[in-house]
Amino acid sequence: MANNKKRGGIVVFVVILLIAAGIGAYTIATDSSRYDGSAGFFNNFIVRKDYIASLYIEGVIETENKTYNHEWLIDTIRSLEDDEKNKAILLTVDSPGGGVYESDEVYLALRDYTEHTGRPIYAYMTTLAASGGYYISCAAETIYANRNTLTGSIGVIASQSVDMTELLKKLGVKVETITAGKNKNMLNINSPLTDEQRAIMQSIADEAYEQFTAIVAKSRGMKIGEVKKLADGRIYTASQAKKNGLVDEIGTWEDALSSLRKELDDDESVVTTYRYEKKDSLLEMLSEAVSKAGKTDALIPDAIRSELMLGISYPAYIYRK
């Protein structure tokens, strides 16, 4: 009898694992598919009428998070480019920015869309379209901002390091990292930055800054010197941004759509929404629940935890509150 109960418990455990694996596989499949918040999956096969793509770019621009998936976004832009039923893209941007690489790749994909199809791109900024969010918006021929939008933040964070050598020493913790190359360990929490290493990271920031300002100058029809006067990393209100030539109009999403329709001379095309939203697998939900229940971070002081979470180890066009 005991053996039967044991075997029964094993069977139940295996079934739970199989269900979790199945849900995980389903989640992966849906995450990598084109997701339309109003019409379901594989939207390009469903829509038969001419349409304007309402494409949302939300959250931190990186490989993947709850609201942003880089691979999905690039694939979606390229699919729209290949679809003759698509007549234009209306971007809705609500992002503090993100990685230099990801921001530039999205910008280039949008520019390719316009150059290869001749179709227009408009951008509408909501709460925040800063740094990389503004960088991507520069791919649009016309930029609308909500009257409460914060934008700009034209600048670069090359990296952020936290020097914890003194703290580790007080705690009696000794960290050893074996490397080859004198600068291989830079940005490590147990290795203070040298002047040479600061210069290395500054050169990376400067190069990314030159790229950013050149993109803005080209997009906005401004001289590079004019852009650099504005590009000190600060954010701008919508009215300030318009006054300085960083956006074209202040209005609503409907205003932007109306203007785009007027340019297209088209009141009949439907508007189809493309918006990424990650769905956690059962395993991810269980892992999060276990983590919260275990309170594994309880021993880390809040000030230190916040610094570690905000750490940036790659060049980023991002607005920091």
Language-model segments: what does each one mean?
Residues 130-131, 150-157:
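Short gly/pro/ser/thr-enriched loop/turn and capping motifs at secondary-structure boundaries
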Residues 1-120, 128-129, 142-146, 160-321:
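N-terminal organellar transit peptides
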Residues 102-103, 133-136, 156:
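Short, conserved acidic/polar surface loops in the N-terminal third of protein domains
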Residues 136-142:
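Alpha-helix C-terminal capping segments
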